[in-house]
Amino acid sequence: MKNLGYYNGEIGLIEEMKVPMTDRGLYFGDGIYDAAYSRNHVIYALDEHIARFYRNLSLLDLNLDMTPQQLGELLCDLVRRVDDGEQFVYWQATRGSALRQHVYPEDGHGRANLMVMLRPVKIRDKDAPMKLISAPDMRYLYCDIKTLSLLPSVLSAQKAKEAGVDECVMHRDGRVTECSHSNVSMLKGGVFITPPTDCYILPGVGRAHLLSACRTLGIPCEERPFTMDELRDADEIIVSSAGILCSAVTELDGLPVGGKDAATFGKLQDYLFDDWFEKTRCE
């Protein structure tokens, strides 16, 4: 089985799974999600992704009838059921099912729906540089929550596709926030600089791994706002996410960027890919 689906205890092919029309995720995007990647049927950084998922459940007043340990065991069991060990593992919880009304359903504090989807996807190749465009950040101020309400990110990602590039980096009130579905950081003068984790960006697991790698490798790091002009002038621009461990950017808005500190970037990238391969190797 390749494309595996799960919904409230039911398991089958994604294409054959059924979700009730009254699921509040369909009406309002009233829910949260997370995603990770597996290799050799081992999910990378699973504990970190689950911790973020439960933090977001709490922020949205959602109660999932499952402990973090139980969710982890479920995800690992589902990954072991698929043919290919390299999988994109996606899961979401919504505020239950009820006829459409904005307020919570009467049982909305204890009847969350859980959906899981698995399909064969590899992480981005380390030798594949990225091209970006930029656009104003039109999202609202819940960007630190991995909510299902992703319309602005969908539109930005589509703009990137139509421009023939990989991602769209967004900016708000003069400062860089993040890309449509990944974090963006930079190297300047040997220092790793990444936006702070406030309401404007998602606290990415990949971003956290970059900061940890910097500390291990002795690379100075700063968490602070920076502008698009600073980004264009960076020695290296770095994109990161669950599926993009550490990728260099070579073009921004049609102009060449980066390529000025390959040594420091290479250390970071090698460290992160070594960690990926080590923690997902066959036992």
What are these regions (language model features)?
Residues 97:
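Feature marks short, surface-exposed loop/turn motifs that line or immediately flank catalytic pockets
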Residues 75, 80-93:
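Ordered, amphipathic secondary-structure segments that act as subunit-interaction surfaces
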